[in-house]
Amino acid sequence: MTRPEAVNIAERLFAGLSGEFRAVVEATQDGVVAGLGFVDPSLAPAEAGRWRALAEEGQPVTAGTPLVEVIGNAAELGVAEDYVLGPLGFASGIATRAYQFKEACPPGLSIACGGWKKLPAPLKPLLRAGLAAAGLLPRLVAGDFVYISKNAVTLLGSVEQAIRAGLAVDHGPVAVQVKNVEEALFAARAGAGVIMVDTASLDDLAAVH
């Protein structure tokens, strides 16, 4: 693994310090812990001390709660800072906001987040970890299904033709994106198992419902 220049600078900066130090990462606000599986010293590009989780994945915490302990020399703590805070902060931020959505969700309604698929590849596992910690689904439904986006509907010619193509795949129910009541009715008649109103308009959702 290539050593970043920041590591070399940290080692030179702290060259005059000896002995071990202890650092503790604490929550700065109330939230939900996520991403601990990615807080791994072996992922750092240089020696980063000894790390120990002080909280559990999915644990609700208050501001000031200790999350991770790092013990090492000054240079190791300097390296650890960049590789502990990032994954923990990103995933926990997602988990905290996702948990707020879940708590505000009416009874009988579930929340799924499929937007993680469009994130840069390195961020996808952290977002999924945040969703899992909050108890949100990363997919529309559990199990196998065929997802047909608006773009796929356009390419296949119509909602009805798209659903027929999806059913022919024979990989579970067909989930299709629609824009209005007319398309939703076509989808239902054509055999769609899941109808997704994808306009970001609550009025459109209410009309289809």
Where are these regions (language model features)?
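Acidic/glycine-rich phosphate/pyrophosphate-binding loops and surrounding catalytic core
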Residues: M1-A190, V194, A200, A206
